[in-house]
Swiss-Prot record:
Stated name of the protein: Ribonuclease P protein component
InterPro entries: Ribosomal_Su5_D2-typ_SF, Ribsml_uS5_D2-typ_fold_subgr, RNase_P
Lineage: Bacteria, Bacillati, Bacillota, Clostridia, Natranaerobiales
Underlying gene: rnpA
GO MF annotation, one: tRNA binding
Subunit structure: Consists of a catalytic RNA component (M1 or rnpB) and a protein subunit.
Assigned protein family: Belongs to the RnpA family.
Length: 115
């Protein structure tokens, strides 16, 4: 099982929000900022407007799993933030997967030989 390297500190999130490029779909916003490492670091954020705490945690688990499965197919060396939008509580696994693939294609993070 692959380990996900996460953004944990507030300053890390602020840097990506401030200087990163954003790509959005109906349910998810992806913020991307190049880092000087050869790995991707990712942060997950679900605001309080998305359901109750159980729903927010479910959405975070969905995002984390979709990222974990697709990270090997992505370009490395980026800090990413996956931000769930207001209607993200409507997501199921397959819809979340489609949205994530759409965002990675839009941001050119998906490697060319995949999908």
């Amino acid at each position: 099982m692959s380990q996900i390297v996460t953004l944990k500190k507030n300053y890390q999130f602020r840097r990506v929000f401030r200087y990163g490029q954003s790509y959005a779909t109906k349910y998810i916003v992806l913020f991307v900022l190049e880092n000087s490492l050869n790995i991707n670091r990712v942060g997950f954020s679900v605001g309080k407007k998305v359901g109750n705490s159980v729903t927010r945690n479910r959405v975070k688990r969905l995002l984390r799993e979709v990222y974990r499965l697709n990270n090997p197919n992505m370009m490395q060396g980026y800090d990413l933030i996956l931000l769930a939008r207001f209607r993200a509580d409507e997501l199921d696994y397959h819809k979340c997967q489609r949205e994530f693939i759409r965002l990675t294609k839009k941001s050119k993070l998906l490697q060319k030989n995949v999908i």
